[in-house]
Structures are given as C-alpha cells and as structure tokens.
C-alpha cells in the first residue's frame, strides 16, 4: 500500500473491532503533535496488551495486563506518517510487535484517548453481540442510514 499512500499521512485500522471514534478529531490530534504515529487508546476491563502512557499522551511501552489493571489498550485506529514504512520488515512483520514498539522507543508514538464506544470482535460471542446491537438499531458506532438485515437464528 505504500505506493498508494505517497507522502501523505494515512489512516490504518485492524479489522477486529468497532468504535465510534471521531476520525476528524483523531486526525486533528495527530497533526497537533508532529510525531510519526497516533493510536487510539481505550480503557476496558479485559485481558489485553496495554499501553504505558505519559501525561502528555506519549506511548512509552507495551505490556500485558490483567483484567483489574485499568490501563488503556490500543483500540486499533491509527494515523501514521509514511515514514512508518521504514520500520517495517516486509509483509511478515507483526505491526504491533515491531513498528509500534519501535515508535514508542523512539518517542514517536502518541495516544488519542477515546472515551466512547469500542468493542473487539475476537470471537463468535462478540460478533453476535455486535450484530444484535446493529439489528436492534442500538449500534453506537453506526453513523449512516441503511436497511439492517435480520439476525440469523444461529447468531441470536
């Protein structure tokens, strides 16, 4: 994708979560600090890898947490400068274990703290819960209008 990005900042997300982050505010925050990368941070009560964040929102490190930790996690919505491609070692690298860690070590990774809705979709239970919210027109991330399909019986 590097050839399509050119010299412009770009947005990247993982495909396993949904949220109602205001993209324009995320991009505005990214432009305000002059670093190479901004990730969206959310607080949640789950076992996930968490972020050590300074008072000025710089990400200093990544670590594992337990459910009662309370530390924020990477929600997977990012704004990146094209220089981030220099930190990638081909298609086989794991972005969050290589580039994001290196960016944090270099002091080039900032966090945009999101306090709204965020939900991972790592298993069928979470997928079904999100589909139910969508079908019932209670999906906080839904900012568009469209006809919502019925939930299949297996997903209820």
Q: Where do the language-model regions lie?
A:
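Extracellular disulfide-bonded cysteine-rich modules/repeats
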Residues: 50-51
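Catalytic-core segments of class I nucleotidyltransferases/pyrophosphorylases
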Residues: 9-11, 18, 24-31, 44-46, ...
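A short, conserved acidic/glycine-rich loop-to-beta-strand motif
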Residues: 33-43
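Small/polar loops that bind or transfer phosphate-bearing groups
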Residues: 14-15, 39
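Extended acidic/charged loop-beta regions that coordinate divalent cations
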Residues: 54
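Active-site nucleotide-sugar/metal-binding loop of Leloir-type enzymes
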Residues: 1-9
């Amino acid at each position: 994708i590097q050839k399509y990005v050119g010299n412009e900042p770009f947005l990247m997300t993982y495909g396993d979560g949904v949220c109602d982050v205001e993209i324009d505010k995320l991009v505005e925050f990214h432009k305000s600090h002059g670093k190479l990368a901004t990730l969206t941070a959310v607080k949640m009560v789950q076992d996930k890898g968490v972020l050590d964040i300074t008072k000025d929102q710089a990400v200093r490190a990544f670590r594992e947490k337990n459910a009662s930790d309370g530390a924020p996690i990477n929600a997977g919505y990012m704004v990146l400068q094209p220089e981030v491609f220099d930190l990638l070692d081909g298609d086989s690298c794991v972005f969050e274990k290589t580039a994001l860690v290196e960016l944090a070590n270099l002091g080039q990774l900032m966090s945009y703290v999101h306090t709204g809705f965020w939900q991972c979709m790592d298993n069928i239970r979470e997928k079904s819960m999100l589909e139910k919210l969508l079908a019932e027109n209670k999906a906080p991330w839904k900012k568009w209008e469209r006809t919502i399909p019925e939930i299949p019986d297996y997903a209820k």
